[in-house]
């Protein structure tokens, strides 16, 4: 399916771009692989995408037109029907929060500033990618990136934001055989637990939760 994603990017991107594909044959994990690819990237901006996504026409130039040095930006998210390679436009997801266990939840609301991002596709400057330590390998190999993105942005004076100028479809996997890990050994659980250990009583997180209307009573 990664091949179809690359083909889709090549069909719909309109600017000056390069596609770097991570084939994690040595099992170093998604964060480590992202860091390897980010170091190889030659542009000023990096867009991370999962290998099972499709994109709207000109998504790259439209996203870059909205970028600044304080933002992690994501296109409007919709489910992808991978069998037909078609986007289900009836379910649009633009707002995301993380709960008191630092697990992402989809929230109601339109595009704009958001507490965090779903994590399957987003754009950041290369400088902020490394300066904010977006893919912190101490959080484990995979998972928990929604809260990680929100924390990295907001606690470094930046923000997370979604936009309607571009959109993408993402395959939401449900069956055990579709996941890149054993469901009983979910590395994402380590990531969210570690984020909770580090930040649960951080006043900046409490203020962030208040900003997005999240109850802080379970954080204390």
Regions found by a protein language model. Name each.
Residues 1-216:
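Catalytic cores of eukaryotic secretory-pathway lumenal/extracellular enzymes that build
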Residues 219-220:
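Long, compositionally biased intrinsically disordered regions
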